[in-house]
Structure formats: structure tokens, C-alpha cells
Amino acid sequence: LRVAYWKRYGATLLGMIEHHAINPHAFLQDTHPLPDLLAKLGPHKALQESLRRLKGSKVILTNAPRHYAHAVLRHAALDALVEQVICIEDMCFAGRFRPKPSVAMLKMICARLGVSSRQCLLVEDSVENLRAARRLGMQTILVLEHGWRGRPRSAHAGHARVLTHQVHSARQLTRLLSVRSSPAVKAER
């Protein structure tokens, strides 16, 4: 059910609201437990160094709930390295949640940040989210996790048209961006 709603709506939460009339805030709290994750997670030195070296504003844009995103960032010692964290609770307008990959939400976020979408770079692990960003003219980088053998989690035919680049690590991202100048970096990991 979780995967089916994620594929159909872009976020499991939207399917749960649509079909089960759940309380979204209770759902987000109950479905994002932290203790097990935090036990496996520690400071991420390579990512810390990469974020320190990147030019431009760094904004986390995540479909995760606020309590979860902030706890993960603190535990990984990344919280002081980003200017802003935009969570799923912030992706609500006209009385409805509009998480990634909503093009309308991405436009709203750009307006809120006071930047043109063409000034933004979205670093993501979801091709669908990158596709929405490319429709607005954003630069895009697909993060491939180790062990995927080059296949993104949400691979679709023709995904190369929505990608500016692909990377496998924080160090590779830093090297790639060190040769480019980007006024705003939007990161999600």
C-alpha cells in the first residue's frame, strides 16, 4: 500500500488522506520513528565537508516530517550547514498537502525563497522529483546510492532527459559543483 500510494500520488501521505481520511500529522509522527534510525546514523564527515565547500544557499527540501528531518540533520551534524529546512508540513497550500514532485509546490518554494527556478539546483534520489524540477528549468542532479549499479530507485525510460548529472557520493557532488557556480543549491538526502 505504501509503495502503491507513493507511486500514484508522489507521497504515501496523500494516498492515506485520499482513501482513509487519516490525520496527516498523527500519520507523519507514527510512520517516522527515530530511535532505530538514529542508532545507525552518526556524523557524516564527507557530507559535512562537502556542504561546507559548496557555494550558494543550501536548503533542505524533504517530504519527511519536521521532527524527523531536524533530528536526522542534528544527529548527522549537518543542521548548522544549511540555511533552511522545508518539510512536508511546509508544503501545504489551498488547504492541501502538495509535496514533491508537485510543480506548483516547487514554484511556491522558489517564490518563498525569492529565487527564480532557473537559479536552483535540485539534488535528489527520485527521478520523478527531478522531472518536476526540470519542467521549471532547474538544474538537476540524481544521487545514486551504492549498490544500485547505476540504476536510480525510481528509474523510468527516458530519465536522462531530466538529469543534468548523476553522482554516487557527497565528494563526487562537491567535485562536480566546484567547477560550476550555482547561486542556490537545493539538497535532499
Q: What is each stretch, according to the model?
A:
Residues 1-4, 35, 57, 93-97, ...:
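Conserved short-loop catalytic and cofactor-binding motifs
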Residues 1-45, 66-70:
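N-terminal helical cap/lid subdomain that shapes the substrate entry/recognition surface
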Residues 45-46, 104:
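Short, conserved clusters of charged catalytic residues that mark active-site
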Residues 52, 66, 70-189:
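Asp-based, Mg2+/Mn2+-dependent phosphohydrolase catalytic module
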Residues 57-59, 139:
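Proline-centered loop/turn at the N-terminus of a beta-strand
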